[in-house]
């Protein structure tokens, strides 16, 4: 059984978030959180029973904030809010991401600045632990005021409304609650608003994209090293003195990864003597530390921004227990998430763009020195000709997907919400970009492995030969033309499973090694 994970509000590390997404451990809440939640809920209860009008507690919402709501209608107000805001469309968000949404929403509410009862936070974790996951449509949020529509669908499940997924089957929410040992919840003052106001959906989607890109990045470093060996490229561009003179942290770390992978290669030793004519390789080989280092820098920036956001309170209004104040602000505006996701999208697209160029180099015998299209009898066999076309198609698609979403904004709610972040789309499309990059890098892994085999009996480094064995365990050598699609799918699965992660240790928790 997976080891349980205790959520500490404000203390969710990137490793913890990654573990929730990939391993689905049982979740518990730090017991110290309960006093903070009770104190903030008491502040809200006092206001709800008083005479003062306070936004989100006894008023309408958005453009209707000036409407005062009678005490007898406060529960109906919260229920109406959820029902009216559950307007999402599109394919459901993936289960692993929904589980992450539940976890970071619970942790945010448990800080004790939202005025919500602890039993609702416990219910969110109970759903995750029972694998009863709200069906949340992926479209319908503009990333301010929070992820209203998708989080309303999440909240509907707590009310016994809508649908949930359990062990892959879609069930009515009421049945799902029973499986989780829960009953439909009646929301009190501010609780519905606290549940739907926040950036947890866009943050979880962006984190999910980051975790997929992280694996594609590791595989791309490996593929790039294999390509260097396949075309008998130079190892000199990875000399630490080159990167040190520039000083870019990501470049320094990526160059070190290449040295780790290439060190001790007999193949390289066989051709890197005084007679070697390899003076300068194409940029797609020689500039890998520079390009992939810049990508790594952006991944680290995104990781830091998203970790901060996952630990933040993005509700509105906020309950300050120490003073009894309820402050209206704009923490729900997901601009940090949108910009981080946009930069990550551009960076991930560059992984694929560079990999596609190396595939083109490998199949071009005039550059690579390998047989045309990496097949022994070209002409009779087409080899990797159209696999490269697929890579080019995916790389080109990513160029469109990488267009920044955060530069767009449409006013909503009768111009009350007159600038929005588009963070949810910015984050959601990362999954498509990551899938495309994984496909491209997978093709390069197969092409580079094929190219390397033309140099047998010479062998590469121990690490790269380990990678070769892993590849060939799933996909045999390409001798003559065969039905190719299953091979591409198999290598993409190998990347997605993280099988290459241990060979390419990538640390996103730091800004650099120096």
Swiss-Prot record:
GO terms for biological process: L-histidine catabolic process to glutamate and formamide; L-histidine catabolic process to glutamate and formate. The modification 2,3-didehydroalanine (Ser) is found at residue 145. It comes from the Bacteria. It is found in: Cytoplasm. It catalyses: L-histidine = trans-urocanate + NH4(+). One of its GO terms (molecular function) is histidine ammonia-lyase activity. This is Histidine ammonia-lyase.
